[in-house]
């Protein structure tokens, strides 16, 4: 059992949790939810013994084996499969002991170790590791490739597989779907449903949470609130609790007003002074119930487009690719006002390539793309977060689009996206990934597009913002094409699903559950093909061709790999600076008046490191995305 009792956690001067209490029973699967920055990841860091509590206590069995996803993956020469097996630390220890016993020819030790290996099912570990990697999207050929060959997103999948292979009692997962496509999300959901240990899962994907968790811990107002059931059940229970809280608050405010009125009237009258004083004490003793904040903090909608030409966009026999590699071939697509299309397809099939083609970021190799007069594109992709001007605020970004508008109108509009008070005029260099994503969306919505192209728009967004975006998209009058691993968003906002597969883009006859079955069928076919003898693959010429292709791919990707390595070194340096600054800020004596200059310098160091780290991370993400795309294309040829 995990017990948090009167827990207090600070980050510098900011209190994240105060007198927070919660209990998690063995075997429970808990969804940890709350707004960005409320302390969810910090709570996991506490359980991992990376930080200490500032007050209160927490306990869990000392014998428990913990597993979590490492955030760093060095460019190792080790094979992917072996790297994943490293996640089972007991197996690796026994393996080393067995090697040593064999060297010493110690028969008794060998027998004892074999017994321990039998007990942990060690003989199946390679097949279990391969199964995890297949589920996360790796091909058989990739299992023996060195870790250094993979881009950042794929290395995060390796880290996830490493955490899953550990025979853990407690599994801690912080946004595990962020680097996954829909196929891998569906597979991970099945795996976690069958997991036998205790799970604490942070996710902003309600459709991912619902079938997995049986309890929700919601962090808000520096407290932890416990709810039995899945996320959908939590929503209903919380709404009920807040409604009751609001009713209590309103009733209490009537009582407070009555008492205050009495005090104001009779405080100065000698004959009534004693009664007034008793009312004052009563008022002070009353526990003030905070007003319930039921409303979503994000409020925005798409204004009607200025024009809705029909069709908005038309593609005829369009082919697309990179260099001499064709990714999509002979595409036919017609987008009209009201088209609401969700793109499905396996990783590397070409979904993002199609979005770039529609957005004009990628020129077709052949065929024609017809754009209507008056078309206005709204295009969202992760790399666009980089295009924000680091030295400008949200208000300055929006004012550039609307120079004639009153500043108050722009401020009111930005408030609907969570930019209020000083945040409206803060430089974006200090913004988190979620804040940058909200600002890019705000700029898109302002421009009244009639064709929206969204490539994974929910990455970095919390549940409240995802819900606000979903509601706004439902009311959008133009055409929509979206790629997302958020199934709730896909179900709620799209009418038609298109499958990107085998270089084709075609309507998919079915829903997301049917797509899940399609994935399963394709995987079975591929497994059967892998098991069949391949005379050609064993030929000397085939091996020679394979080596040639691998050498060409290494040469093509070498400049990107060097840039990624440079950025990783820079991020490591900035992380060290940030950690140093935050360690200093955690010292309460630093806030003494006589150390004001030191505090200011420390805060400046923290801000500078955060800003530099954010810029580095965005450049790293774009480089990783380019490398990932090149590697995927290389594997498909």
Swiss-Prot record:
Can you tell which superkingdom this protein's organism belongs to?
Answer: Bacteria
Q: Tell me one GO molecular function of this protein.
A: ATP binding
Q: What is one Pfam family matched by this protein?
A: ABC_tran_Xtn
Q: According to the record, what happens upon gene knockout?
A: No visible growth or ribosome-associated phenotype.
Among its keywords, does the record have ATP-binding?
yes
| UniProt KW keywords | ATP-binding, Nucleotide-binding, Repeat
The residues that hold ATP are 34-41, 345-352
Q: In the UniProt annotation, what is the result of changing residue 456 to Q?
A: Causes growth defect at 18 degrees Celsius in bipA deletion strain
The record lists its disulfide bonds as none
The UniProt entry, under PROSITE patterns, shows: ABC_TRANSPORTER_1, ABC_TRANSPORTER_2
Per UniProt, the ranges with Basic and acidic residues bias are 542-553
Task: State how changing residue 175 to Q affects the protein, per the record.
Answer: Causes growth defect at 18 degrees Celsius in bipA deletion strain
Recorded hits in NCBIfam families, A to Z, give: PRK10636.1
| Protein's job | Genetic data indicate it may be involved in ribosome assembly or function. Ectopic expression exacerbates the cold-sensitive growth phenotype of a bipA deletion.
Q: Can you tell me which family this protein belongs to?
A: Belongs to the ABC transporter superfamily. ABCF family. YheS subfamily.
What is this protein identified as? Probable ATP-binding protein YheS
Q: Which species does this protein come from?
A: Escherichia coli O6:H1 (strain CFT073 / ATCC 700928 / UPEC)
Lineage, opening ranks: Bacteria, Pseudomonadati, Pseudomonadota, Gammaproteobacteria, Enterobacterales
Gene for this protein?
A: yheS
